[in-house]
Amino acid sequence: MMKPLNAPHRWGQALLLLCTLALGGCMSSAKSVPSRYSLAFDADRQVNAAAGQRPAPIKLRVLLLRSSAEFMDADFFSLQNDAKGVLGNSLLDSDQFFLTPGQIGKKLAGQATLDARYIGIIAEYQNLDGKAWRITLPLPEPTETNFYKVWQFSPDELEAHIVAGINGLRTVNDED
């Protein structure tokens, strides 16, 4: 003959079942989440000034890249005229805008794709001689989400401050 379960034992089983069901509701399948980026752009007051002339607006192109190799190997005019043809499958997305001389605080933020590993930036100076007209910024690796949403973390984010100066593009550390 079986002994009846005592009340504390039943409550323990009920609590265990309730916890199991509650955690099951928080479960999701693990997946990769692309990194995010937040870029701030400034332009020097004398940016894009040709010899003896006034400063002029400068066009910037921001490229989301699978690889930086093709970008760094290409010449300026090829990238300017046919970025898609030159970069091929390495180019995932692009954006462009102008900065006026002395402009500060232009923001560009977004989420990369899972394949994106770099952001390439091109500055279209009137005179390229000796200027750093391109830079690349490595993106954080995509984040693997956790099995339980209770412990979910946000993907890493690239934060960068880029200045279009008289000698070319450069990144600055805002903590200085």
Tell me what each language-model feature is.
Residues 116-126:
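A short, solvent-exposed beta-strand micro-motif common in secreted/extracellular proteins
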Residues 22-25:
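C-terminal motif of bacterial Sec signal peptides marking the signal peptidase cleavage site
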Residues 52-61:
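Short coil-to-beta strand junction motifs in C2/discoidin
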Residues 134-176:
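Glycine-rich, aromatic-bearing surface loops/beta-hairpins
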Residues 104-112:
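Exposed aromatic-hydrophobic patches
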Residues 2-15:
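Bacterial N-terminal signal peptides that target proteins for export
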Residues 39-51:
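Short amphipathic, basic-aromatic surface patches that mediate peripheral association
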Residues 27-30:
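Bacterial signal peptide processing site
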